[in-house]
A protein has these predicted regions:
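An anion/pyrophosphate-binding glycine-rich loop and adjacent beta-alpha core
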Residues: 1-126, 197
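Alpha-helix capping and helix-loop boundary segments enriched in small/acidic/polar residues
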Residues: 16-20, 108-111, 134, 154, ...
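FAD-binding beta-loop-beta segment adjacent to the flavin cofactor pocket
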Residues: 145-164
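A conserved FAD-binding loop/helix module that cradles the flavin
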Residues: 174-196
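Conserved small/polar residues in nucleotide/adenosyl-binding loops
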Residues: 202-207
Length: 211
């Protein structure tokens, strides 16, 4: 599950669009504290810029002060869904939370933010017709990829003798949700530490059996 995707905005959007997790380095995630504000946002009678900071719930920063908006993907995804399930979602479907760069722009300047995220902001604006420099982005978790699926034994061999599956093709070494770049790490671990021994073991066994 990827927590930083563009939610459904209209009938012509066929899927949720994956954004970069790098956005959470500087963007602050929030929903309204008041349910009536969330309902007004869903109905389109209020804009996010109408809601003062005091009425914004930066729920990841509140729940996880040591990590803030940089919590692992599975934590960010579950927290966003929980807030939306509680009625605090912010787009017309109620299935979105805000990712706000106002604070980064105030702190760093728009030029710095543009240099870091300009291509992502352009993609967001092209899809949503909203300017993320002026109004908060909306994001929602989406299915990113299937975590494994091919059966392997403890030596990473499939049900077909001599055929091994490594990396994300077999299973996840990383628990509830993978961390950034862990696909590479899992492939390296399987390939470097496991396959040289398992393949040699299998080929020696096969030789003994006259195969």
């Amino acid at each position: 599950i990827h927590p930083t995707c563009i939610p459904v905005h209209g009938d012509k959007q066929s899927k949720l669009t994956l954004m970069s997790e790098s956005l959470r380095n500087d963007g602050r995630i929030w929903v309204p504290k008041k349910l009536e504000d969330a309902k007004a946002l869903q109905a389109g009678t209020k804009k996010p810029t109408d809601i003062p900071d005091a009425d914004r719930d930066f729920y990841l920063e509140r729940r996880y002060p040591a990590f803030g908006n940089l919590v692992p993907r599975d934590v960010a995804s579950r927290a966003a869904k929980e807030r939306c399930d509680a009625g605090f979602g912010v787009n017309n479907t109620g299935l979105a939370v805000f990712l706000d760069f106002k604070y980064a722009i105030d702190r760093l300047g728009e030029d710095v933010v543009r240099a870091r995220y300009g291509n992502l902001f352009d993609m967001y604006e092209e899809i949503t017709d909203e300017n993320p420099y002026k109004t908060p982005m909306m994001i929602f978790p989406a299915i990113h990829y299937t975590m494994g699926g091919i059966w392997v034994d403890y030596e990473l061999m499939t049900s077909i003798k001599g055929l091994y599956a490594i990396g994300e093709a077999n299973f996840s070494d990383h628990g509830a949700n993978r961390l950034g770049a862990s696909a590479l790490m899992q492939g390296l671990a399987d390939g470097y530490f496991v396959l040289p021994y398992t393949c040699l073991l299998y080929t020696s066994d096969a030789a003994d059996e006259g195969l």
